[in-house]
């Protein structure tokens, strides 16, 4: 346990085709068993499908979809005097991004469809239009935080 200085957060290199750091992070999160080439192939195929369906540039569609899914607040359990309260807390930007990505990927994996790129494209388009499982999860999180607003003074 070093005590000299804080370690800076490593920023992954941007992806090759779209030169986007956010897309590179998403690809890494989607990867299973270290198969990055497979994850990259799935993601690029997914973005091509998005472009065919919308007729727009796929990267702004992906970015907007991620923005629509990122939560602003979440609830954390806090034990006070023998009872546990769900305390709403604001989320820092890096965690918001990570949760949004995780929810989109999880929803796409649970979706029914032919291939992962098809399911992922459908989920991203749903998130872009503010619908779908990942967006619903964000709404549920916000609703839970709103319901427990009375306990916000227990923040730490």
From Swiss-Prot:
Keywords: Ribonucleoprotein, Ribosomal protein, RNA-binding, rRNA-binding, tRNA-binding. CDD domains: uS7_Bacteria. One of its GO terms (molecular function) is tRNA binding. GO terms for cellular component: small ribosomal subunit. The keyword Methyltransferase does not apply. It comes from the Bacteria. InterPro entries: Ribosomal_uS7, Ribosomal_uS7_bac/org-type, Ribosomal_uS7_CS, Ribosomal_uS7_dom, Ribosomal_uS7_dom_sf. Belongs to the universal ribosomal protein uS7 family. HAMAP family: Ribosomal_uS7_B. One of the primary rRNA binding proteins, it binds directly to 16S rRNA where it nucleates assembly of the head domain of the 30S subunit. Is located at the subunit interface close to the decoding center, probably blocks exit of the E-site tRNA. This is Small ribosomal subunit protein uS7. It comes from Treponema pallidum (strain Nichols). The gene is rpsG.
């Amino acid at each position: 346990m070093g005590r000299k200085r804080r370690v800076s957060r490593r920023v992954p290199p941007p992806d090759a085709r779209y030169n986007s750091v956010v897309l590179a992070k998403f690809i890494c999160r989607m990867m299973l068993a270290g198969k990055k080439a497979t994850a990259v192939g799935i993601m690029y195929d997914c973005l091509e499908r998005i472009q065919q369906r919308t007729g727009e540039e796929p990267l702004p569609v992906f970015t907007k979809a991620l923005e629509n899914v990122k939560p602003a607040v979440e609830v954390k359990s806090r034990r006070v005097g023998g009872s546990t309260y769900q305390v709403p807390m604001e989320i820092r930007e890096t965690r918001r991004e990570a949760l949004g990505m995780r929810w989109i990927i999880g929803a796409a994996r649970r979706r029914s469809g032919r291939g992962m790129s098809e399911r992922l494209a459908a989920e991203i388009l749903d998130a872009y239009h503010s619908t779908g499982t990942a967006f619903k999860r964000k709404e549920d999180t916000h609703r839970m935080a709103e319901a427990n607003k009375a306990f916000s003074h227990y923040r730490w």
